[in-house]
Amino acid sequence: MKIDLFAISGTNLGEATEYIESTLGFKMQKGGKHEIFGTHNNLLGLKDGLYLEAISIDPSSNKINYPRWFNLDNFHGSPKLTNWICNCEKIEEIVLNTIVDVGKVKKITRDKLNWKMTIKNDGILPFNNIFPAFIEWNKNSSHPSKSLNLV
């Protein structure tokens, strides 16, 4: 298991992106939309497959009737680091062997990307959103970092 990405949330994508770009001095690349959660993102590639994600609710998305991941429905204030996500293999086994409720494993797709991720029904990760989410990338899918310019 290793850290896959850090998520920086904002009330809108422009704010979150600007925060990262002005803080680090690097331009982010366009990510995409997560239709299932009504969110969208931009990405910044780092070393060794690690990347940063600016994420927010997508105002043009369809209304959903369940909580969004990363507790974005309750996000307010300035952009900030809100979550970290660990890349793992055998995500179902990890969920069974983790002593806290990390949520259910959901299959997610976006463009050419396919992955499984732990998602809690209330959208809040354990320990008030401080515990990591777990992600397992589909072996037949590319990893986002492979298409990102590295900084």
What residue ranges belong to the model's regions?
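Glycine/small-residue-rich interface belts in oligomeric ring/scaffold proteins
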Residues: E15-N71
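Extreme N-terminal starter segment of soluble prokaryotic enzymes
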Residues: M1-F6
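A short, structural micro-pattern
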Residues: G38, D48, S78, N128-N129
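Short, functional N-terminal and low-complexity linear motifs
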Residues: G10, S61-N65, N140
